[in-house]
Amino acid sequence: MELNTMGKNHYKWSNKQLREHVEVLDGKRSTHILLKNATYLNSYMREWMTANIWIYNDRIVYVGEQLPEQLTECEVVDCEGKYVVPGYIEPHAHPYQLYNPETLANHAMQFGTTTFINDNLTLFFTLKREEAFRLLDEFNKIPASMYWWCRFDGQTELQNGESLFNSEEIIEWLQHEAVLQGGELTAWPKLLHGDDEMLTWVQETKRLQKKVEGHFPGASETTLAKLKLLGTDCDHEAMTGQEAFTRLMQGYTVSLRNSSIRPDLEVILKELLELGVKQFDRFFFTTDGSHPSFYENGMTNVMISTAIKQGVPVIDAYDMASYNIARYYNMEHVHGSIATGRIANINILESKENPVPISVLAKGKWVKRDGVNTHEALHIDWSKHKVTPLSLDWSIEKEDMIFSNKTGIHLLNNVITKPYTSEINIDCDELSTDHDECFFMMIARDGSWQVNIAVKGFAKELGGLASSYSGTGDIILIGKRKEDMLTAFRRVKELGGGMVIAEKNEVLHEIALPLLGIMSNLKMRELIQEEKQMVKLLQERGYAHDDPAFTILFFSATHLPFIRVTPIGLYDVKSSKVVAPPVNLIKQY
């Protein structure tokens, strides 16, 4: 039988490459890197063992006592006194939280996270499918291993939600070889209450032997059981040890989260250990798309450290960052262990208790060597893939800033909101700094509609903030002074996207977001400093929480209680009703 292998090569390695790998063992070809005398974590034996690890291009071709015959093109690294573990995996990345997928990966690789399973929502919203898929192929060229999920909903109420999330699009995404799961199921109430189209997508995901990720904050045991019956495999929303335990008891794999708005890992692990959990192979770690400054000291490494400090056995802590995840996603043949045939994603540690690697291999290339970053380069040419600055060909003027609706949003913490009725006069150009109410506007990306309301609990002394970074890709303005809001908006427009704070008609601080108005192209170190400065300035002006970028992102997020601003208007999540519809801008300038 002859297979048609023309066109795109769907195999991980070609026949020719596989023959070369075998030739290394025959002594006919030189190994490229030899990790000699390595004390490595054997994920199958669950113990530390000693071996020589042979690497050819991007693959581990042998692990054992033998040494290669041919060393002509080989770099020999003596690992005596060091510990070698598999590269860490982030199973639930949202790689557009001001950074972009490449800058996030470059930064995280310095701390040992070399594989990412990424949300597709931003690509789904902003690019045509063919463009998005070309970009997915482009990501294969970077040292990090990049995989994706396929969303079934937009986690907000959209004017065109049903046409955007249609079966043809979803099925094409699910069938893509780099897509490992469907979800996360932010619209689970629709699924539970009879949305058969979504249930069919879940069924199709399972038929393709891919995973379905939940999103079930605060769900009862019964709800969890029902959603398990409908096909969910894993959930990352447990906030306590008991919630994680309940998920485990209902047959879920449980992703334990530590993020910038839910830094719960320490509590979850402490409580799981108190509940008597001794078996950790159905648990793994995620940072669930945190904002840049949260990653200052790394990513998965921080969670491994926390687990070890809480008393989780060391080998389990490393498995929860690698082997458990690879096995769950059916990619254990290429990821998650130091063994023959795996992709050479390898961390070299100075001690078992310190998961920050001294050296990191990603696809067999050194991205960190003896503490030095050896991979600064950026490879993705975004403009080639229609990922360009935001072009806003419309303006707003004072006469568009009419606030007649007294119902608004009261911000209770970083992201939870409730409806409130403003008691103050908001029919003016400037609000007093004696209270924490501000003007709030959401304006369509194309300038066609706006929602004008009041927001309480965001800031006391903020002149104006404008952001093209938002949950729907629309523009958000917040502030006490309409003039400052306009100044900030005009600067966002000049930048081609960004987050801008203005005061006294001048720009006080800006984060340029030239990739779709959502992502920066700065290296993570620089972006972290810009974000920290923004947080500091907002806190000085009365922002009482710690993650303003998440607050802004989630103003439209209808998977969270209780009231949200969306393209269909001010929206009551509990009753699924529009409280105030959007209005058209007075005129298009």
From Swiss-Prot:
Q: Does the keyword Electron transport apply?
A: no
Q: Which SUPFAM superfamilies match?
A: Composite domain of metallo-dependent hydrolases, Metallo-dependent hydrolases
Catalysis: reaction(s): adenine + H2O + H(+) = hypoxanthine + NH4(+)
Q: Which UniProt keywords apply?
A: Hydrolase
Q: Which GO terms describe its biological process?
A: adenine catabolic process
Q: Name one GO molecular function term.
A: adenine deaminase activity
**Disulfide-bond pairs as recorded:** none
Task: Give the matching CDD domains.
Answer: AdeC
InterPro entries from the entry? Adenine_deam, Adenine_deam_C, Amidohydro-rel, Metal-dep_hydrolase_composite, Metal_Hydrolase
Q: Which Gene3D superfamilies match?
A: Metal-dependent hydrolases (3.20.20.140), Urease, subunit C, domain 1 (2.30.40.10)
The first-level EC class reads: hydrolase
- Domain of life, per the record? Bacteria
EC annotation from Swiss-Prot or TrEMBL: 3.5.4.2
- The reply on keyword Hydrolase is yes
Which family would the database say this protein is a member of? Belongs to the metallo-dependent hydrolases superfamily. Adenine deaminase family.
This chain belongs to which protein, by name? Answer: Putative adenine deaminase BC_3012
Q: What taxonomic lineage is listed for the species of origin?
A: Bacteria, Bacillati, Bacillota, Bacilli, Bacillales
